Amino acid sequence: METDIIGNRTSLLRIIRADIETVLQRDPAARTRIEVLLAYPGLHALWSYRFSHFLWNRGSKLTARILSNTIRFLTGIEIHPAARIGTGFFIDHGMGVVIGETAIIGKNVTLYHG
């Protein structure tokens, strides 16, 4: 699970690109990279999770929770910063999705809701 991505710009950009490609591959409604980048709340929640998870693992638990709650308000998707999520994760129709503190999600998982 990616915990050191923020400290390495190359790794962070690689993961962002991979996340966008994951959406393009798994969602037939996704047309362009710019659309995915700007208009996919599941992706925004995932990126926020990645950063809050990084903060959580470095002891900034309150900051991580505040970020997590802010993104929940904006996207309707709640991912606890202590959850463990592998690469290739895609949330489709994410409104109301809750991923708790003890959740472990492996690589290349697609989550449908509704």
What does each of the following model-derived ranges do?
Residues 1-71, 75:
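Terminal amphipathic alpha-helical/low-complexity segments used for targeting or macromolecular assembly
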